[in-house]
């Protein structure tokens, strides 16, 4: 049978097929997208203009994680077998000690959100910029004797990236086992030669991709946004920095870059290793070595590693922000490069204001993604009208992800206050319960607020109508950003 492509019937059939596929995709969105806003944001355009939205939905909308969930369960089973010979008794004792401490109550429901428990007797150190962070990371790797685990969302082949590469090659030549994991989407500009040089030198390096096979080239919605470094199971790092010169202030338009990391030692490092192991297993079907000390110091602070992702049975990251805001009795200060709260988190912020809580949110004054910046600006204006104190950091680009609740609880990690971190990305955050550490975080944030300009109601009124239109369009698609 010969198809006449010039026949008017052909185009009619083609349009009919596209609309049929649009209906099917719209139904798929209604059944799979977790929020009503996101489902409507996809379903309506798919139903009415499928010829414009089918391909974007294929790229950004697919939400099938059955393979990942199955692999993670298999990884957990294999990890339990592999870890059976390790001495977990000291670690379990720290979990029990944490539950019995007075500070534990300050976390409220937070310990129940994740798979990993709250643990006592950890040591934490605040790293308030890129130089302090990478000086500490490089110094720790220099002293490595057994195993180095490195995971970043972005690795660039620039001055900092090359310095890390050479250091890892040198340690591998000394006999240290080195494992490097990066996100395929976040590190899309990383040349294959960078990874190949590491492999040639004995470093095990792999990309994390949430779907296997050729389709992953087109499906970019789900990203592993975690930043983890663990050295010999004794020293670890977690926070907002990636590997690139811009994180040291090397990007003129965004410099100076403002970000925060934490250096950690203690039993919570087992949780960072477990998170890395799960992601590594998904990428390689193999498990890296896990190192547990035979004993921990008797002095330290309560910490919990909260790993979250789209394969979780509940929306762990979103629920964390909700509980952190709801638990505040005196203050909740949040810094995030993006401010796109869902309805529940936005309502929690408004309620906190009504309770008399000092609610402050610090966001950038410069955009790195213009659509997200526009949507964030509109949400910021609405938050100001609700009584939330919104600030824009002036010196450079603000990328840190920090939450401070009252006088004891702080959270530092990779999660932004936006829908992508809530429901699409794999994130990890370190919760710490300690008055002294919270004081350090407070001192750091006060300095940041001193270098910020508070957003006022006049800023909204002074915004041009065309800009306001752009912001509202950006907000319409914010559930899928």
Swiss-Prot record:
It catalyses: 2 a 1,2-diacyl-sn-glycero-3-phospho-(1'-sn-glycerol) = a cardiolipin + glycerol. Belongs to the phospholipase D family. Cardiolipin synthase subfamily. ClsA sub-subfamily. This is Cardiolipin synthase A. GO terms for cellular component: plasma membrane. Its EC number is 2.7.8.-. Residues 220-247, 394-421 form the PLD phosphodiesterase domain. The active site is at 225, 227, 232, 399, 401, 406. Catalyzes the reversible phosphatidyl group transfer from one phosphatidylglycerol molecule to another to form cardiolipin (CL) (diphosphatidylglycerol) and glycerol. It is a multi-pass membrane protein. Gene3D superfamilies: Endonuclease Chain A. Keywords: Cell inner membrane, Cell membrane, Lipid biosynthesis, Lipid metabolism, Membrane, Phospholipid biosynthesis, Phospholipid metabolism, Repeat, Transferase, Transmembrane, Transmembrane helix. The lineage of its organism: Bacteria, Pseudomonadati, Pseudomonadota, Gammaproteobacteria, Pseudomonadales. It comes from Pseudomonas putida (Arthrobacter siderocapsulatus). Pfam families: PLDc_2 (PF13091), PLDc_N (PF13396).
């Amino acid at each position: 049978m010969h198809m006449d492509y010039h026949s008017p019937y052909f185009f009619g059939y083609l349009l009919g097929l596209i609309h049929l596929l649009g209906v099917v995709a719209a139904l798929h969105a209604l059944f799979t997208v977790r929020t009503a806003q996101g489902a409507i944001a996809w379903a309506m355009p798919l139903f009415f203009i499928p010829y414009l939205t089918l391909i974007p939905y294929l790229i950004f909308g697919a939400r099938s994680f059955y393979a990942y969930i199955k692999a993670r369960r298999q990884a957990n089973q294999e990890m339990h077998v592999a870890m059976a010979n390790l001495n977990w008794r000291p670690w379990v004792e720290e979990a029990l000690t944490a539950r019995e401490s007075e500070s534990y109550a300050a976390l409220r429901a937070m310990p129940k959100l994740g798979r990993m428990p709250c643990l006592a007797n950890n040591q934490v150190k605040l790293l308030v910029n890129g130089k302090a962070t990478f000086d500490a990371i490089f110094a720790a790797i220099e002293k490595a004797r057994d195993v180095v685990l490195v995971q970043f969302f972005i690795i660039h082949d620039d001055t900092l990236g090359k310095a890390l590469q050479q250091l890892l090659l040198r340690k591998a030549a000394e006999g240290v086992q080195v494992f490097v994991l990066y996100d395929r989407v976040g590190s899309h500009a990383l040349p294959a030669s960078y990874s190949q040089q590491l492999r040639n030198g004995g470093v095990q390096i792999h990309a994390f991709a949430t779907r296997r096979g050729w389709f992953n080239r087109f499906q970019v919605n789900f990203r592993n946004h975690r930043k983890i470094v663990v050295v010999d199971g004794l020293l670890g790092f977690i926070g907002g920095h990636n590997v690139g010169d811009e994180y040291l202030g090397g990007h003129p338009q965004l410099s100076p870059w403002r970000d925060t990391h934490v250096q950690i030692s203690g039993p919570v490092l087992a949780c960072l290793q477990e998170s890395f192991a799960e992601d590594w297993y998904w990428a390689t079907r193999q498990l890296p070595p896990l190192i547990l000390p035979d004993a921990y110091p008797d002095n330290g602070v309560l910490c919990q590693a909260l790993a979250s992702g789209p394969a979780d049975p509940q929306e762990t990251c979103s629920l964390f922000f909700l509980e952190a805001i709801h638990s505040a009795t005196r203050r909740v200060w949040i810094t995030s490069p993006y401010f796109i709260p869902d309805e529940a988190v936005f309502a929690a912020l408004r309620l906190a204001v009504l309770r008399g809580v000092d609610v402050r949110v610090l966001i950038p004054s410069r955009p790195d993604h213009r659509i997200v910046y526009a949507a964030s600006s509109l949400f910021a204006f609405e938050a100001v009208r609700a009584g939330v104190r919104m600030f824009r950091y002036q010196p450079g680009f603000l990328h840190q992800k920090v939450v401070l609740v009252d006088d004891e609880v702080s959270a530092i990690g990779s999660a932004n206050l936006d829908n992508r971190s809530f429901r699409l990305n794999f994130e990890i955050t370190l919760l710490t319960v300690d008055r002294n550490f919270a004081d350090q975080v407070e001192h750091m944030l006060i300095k940041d607020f001193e270098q910020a300009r508070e957003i006022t109601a006049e800023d909204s009124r002074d915004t041009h109508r065309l800009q306001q239109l752009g912001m509202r369009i950006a907000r319409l698609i914010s559930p899928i950003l």
